[in-house]
Regions:
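Short aromatic-acidic-glycine turn motif
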Residues: 96-110
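Extracellular beta-rich ligand/substrate-recognition surface
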Residues: 51-57, 106-108, 118-121, 131, ...
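Short acidic, flexible loop segments centered on an aromatic residue
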Residues: 89-100, 176-181, 224
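Extended, loop-rich substrate-binding clefts of extracytoplasmic carbohydrate-active enzymes
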Residues: 13-75, 81-83, 87, 168-194, ...
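Catalytic cores of secreted or luminal carbohydrate-active enzymes
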Residues: 188-234
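Short, hydrophobic/aromatic beta-strand segments
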Residues: 82-92, 219-220
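Acidic-aromatic substrate-binding/catalytic surfaces of carbohydrate-active enzymes
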Residues: 1-51, 112, 116-117, 124-179
Length: 238
């Protein structure tokens, strides 16, 4: 998976245009694999300028992996270094985990693989990642900074073949206005599509946080500990 167009956790997809323009321009760090520029950043486990991996993108994009109170945070900082307003109408973070069951027997799949369950609830949204065998901790991906879970978009450009045992990968979509005006046009959206406008010299950070629930049954309690709203259905409710 180290070739062009294969997505990894840490990639980013950005769709933008000059404010007032008509056509959206797409950029993805998966399109062509090139070296990123490491950055010195004391508060990060690793930091890099990703602009080179995004082709001719007019904005500066930096990525930070951080430890926040024992949790892993993936943050992207986008800065407008031009003299023009730019509107970011598509912003997605690929959620790449091992959900490919191809060529595996039941025992191997249960040992190696996971399945996802997204809740696209904006700032209350989250993605849970559980092992197929159902044991051990569950991974929860949560909004951390300006990263409401607005949509869950299939990454159809990833070359990994789809099959009855592999549904493909998806991205956590923070802004979906560009999608709603192009490939999703005419389709009712679960959440109102949004965008962000960056003025010259302005920057904005977007981050998700990865936390562990002790086990699947503790997911709701972990969400409460993370100060997230939780609704639990009980027998007989309507």
């Amino acid at each position: 998976r180290d070739r062009d167009k294969f997505f990894h956790l840490g990639d980013v997809n950005i769709t933008l245009k000059k404010e007032g323009a008509t056509d959206w321009q797409k950029y993805s760090s998966s399109t062509k694999r090139v070296d990123v520029k490491p950055l010195a950043h004391k508060k990060s486990l690793a930091a890099a300028n990703m602009s080179a991996a995004l082709g001719d993108i007019p904005l500066e994009v930096n990525r930070y992996w951080q430890n926040v109170n024992g949790d892993l945070v993936l943050k992207f900082e986008i800065k407008n270094t031009t003299q023009t307003n730019y509107e970011i109408g598509g912003l997605g973070i690929p959620m790449i985990f091992n959900n490919n069951l191809d060529w595996k027997n039941l025992d191997t799949a249960h040992m190696d693989n996971v399945f996802f369950d997204p809740y696209i609830g904006k700032d209350a949204g989250y993605l849970q990642v559980n092992r197929l065998h159902g044991n051990g901790p569950s991974l929860l991906v949560l909004p951390h900074e300006n990263a409401g879970f607005e949509a869950y978009n299939p990454l159809n450009s990833d070359p990994t073949p789809r099959s009855i045992t592999f549904e493909g990968f998806h991205e956590w979509v923070i802004h979906s206005k560009a999608y709603a005006e192009t490939e999703w046009k005419g389709v009712e959206q679960w959440n109102t599509p949004t965008s962000t406008v960056l003025k010259p010299g302005e920057s904005k950070s977007f981050a998700v946080r990865m936390v562990l629930a002790p086990n699947i049954k503790e997911i709701e309690n972990e969400l409460i500990r993370q100060q997230r709203p939780v609704a639990v259905g009980v027998s007989g409710y309507i």
